[in-house]
Amino acid sequence: MREVRIPAFAKINLRLDILGKRGDRYHELRTIFQTISLHDELRLRTSRNPGISLTIHGNEALSREPASRNLVYRAVDALKRELKIRGGLEIELHKTIPAGGGLGGGSSNAAAALLGYLRLHRKRLAFERLIEIAVSLGADVPFFLFGGRALGVNKGDELYPLADIPKHSILVVAPRNIHVSTPEAFRWAQAPLLASVQSRQLTKSPDNSKLWKFCALCWSAQVGGLSNDFERPVFRRHPRLATLKRDLLRAGATEAMLAGSGSAVFGVFPSPALARRAAVGFPSDQTFVCETISRERYKRLVQTAL
């Protein structure tokens, strides 16, 4: 039996703008993704038993759900069909990233499963096709094939890699008793419906692709500091998350913000020692001291798998 172990890193959004609701029921986004060192681990091994088995450690709720609903299972199943690979597979998912925290754990697991499965079977797949499969699993999944820092546009699924930033120390605080549904958070945001002419202007086509990319990258160059359009509506319904942000700033964070649609909140600290010291002030919550992680680690994973 062959076995592959692969990390699945979490992400934070350094900026997240909700431009409006599109005609296809999705929202038009502009966001800057950044991977952080907090991660889950996947172990994939070939098996003589037919089918795909998935065992989840570290998250009891996820382990009780039908395996076929899990993004890891769906990712491997899609790739198995694409490559027409026979034979069974055993997957172990060791969870550390809090579920439902806005840290991209499920999407990262799916991307890691795609890369790990390719490596396990020593297969290659055109990167464009791999992206298509990733998009079919979720809007955030393609980002985790790149890692580092990237601009996400459209639904967040069209990506433009950005230059990596210097390493920053991060403290993630995840409340144990607050869970935010992403669809609910979008409803709370009450984004305006984009007019059809606006939708056409925001949609990339062969005719406007170069201009569209230029405008998107100009947007990323203009923004500065942390910003998240989910904060106001989510904080209104969960005031404790606003308190966590305030407490992070009081504990020495230079900046703090809601992670994605929540419910985790993160702070940027001058050093790991200060982040660890601040973590002591959140005894009832899950805390993770980590750091931003460059694209290089992802680059090694992609080059090995493809």
Predicted regions, residues:
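Conserved protein kinase catalytic domain
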Residues: R15, F33, Y73, L114, ...
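Contiguous, small/hydrophobic- and glycine-enriched helical/loop subdomains that border
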Residues: G88, A110, L114-L151, K155
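Conserved, helical-rich catalytic subdomain that frames metal- and/or nucleotide-binding sites
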Residues: F144-F146, L151-E255, P270-P283, F288-L306
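Short, basic/glycine-rich phosphate-binding loops at helix/coil junctions
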Residues: P50-E65, A113, V135, A216-S227
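ATP-binding N-lobe of GHMP and related small-molecule kinases
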Residues: M1-G101, L118-I131, I165, A174-I178
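Glycine/serine-rich anion-binding loops at beta->alpha junctions
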Residues: E92-H121, A139, T254-F269
